[in-house]
Curated annotation (Swiss-Prot):
GO terms for cellular component: cytosol. Disulfide bonds: none annotated. This is tRNA (guanine-N(1)-)-methyltransferase. Specifically methylates guanosine-37 in various tRNAs. GO terms for molecular function: tRNA (guanine(37)-N1)-methyltransferase activity. The keyword NAD does not apply. It comes from the Bacteria. S-adenosyl-L-methionine binds at G113, V133, G134, D135, Y136, V137, L138. It catalyses: guanosine(37) in tRNA + S-adenosyl-L-methionine = N(1)-methylguanosine(37) in tRNA + S-adenosyl-L-homocysteine + H(+). It is found in: Cytoplasm. Keywords: Cytoplasm, Methyltransferase, S-adenosyl-L-methionine, Transferase, tRNA processing. The gene is trmD.
Amino acid sequence: MWLGVITLFPEMFRAVTDFGVTGRAVKNGLLELHTWNPRDFTHDRHNTVDDRPYGGGPGMLMMVQPLRDAIHAAKAAAGEEAKVIYLSPQGRKLDQQGVTELAKSSRLILVCGRYEGIDERIIQTEVDEEWSVGDYVLSGGELPAMTMIDAVSRLVPGVLGKQASAEQDSFSDGLLDCPHYTRPESLDGLDVPAVLLSGNHEQIRLWRLQQSLGRTLLRRPELLQNLALTDEQSTLLAQFVEAMDKHA
């Protein structure tokens, strides 16, 4: 996957290129990330990248010309098929379904705003989609962009050691993930569930699915409203609720 990022702080993206899963993906050639800094497209000796908004008010906006030129440079490098995304609290909220959709694109250009945002005409003429990581305001688009890159890259074939790791993540099937355990078998009087030690793969699968359904019901019940549960899932969830009521 090819990724271009428009940012005033390209150094921040070393967190993506140099560390963890995404760092290995870059090293192995599965993820290609390039940055364009609007400051490199300024024409004054101060490298000015902000400007006052029309109509007054507090704060500044990113200057149109350097930002637009940086986007054009990224588009030229990416090719016509690249999708341009502006990270904005006004955009569509990123969830696993959205991540799956974005992962189908081979080339993405992410525009990171700063100050009070960017000129609306840049959004109208240069941006294909706006995305948000939540209903809160950050100082810039860099952290949302890194969040998006990390989430999307996990779905690129070969990035994870086993594709099943991505398929079992929370939200991959609309449910929260089940509990996980490693050694020791007993920790401060808390034991690993016996079914996980049984070696019975079918029983383990059913237990994990039931725990996933139950955890979703308890922590994010609204997620279940959007799902058409199978007969198996409905039965497991009913058993979970019955067991929970008995221990209440």
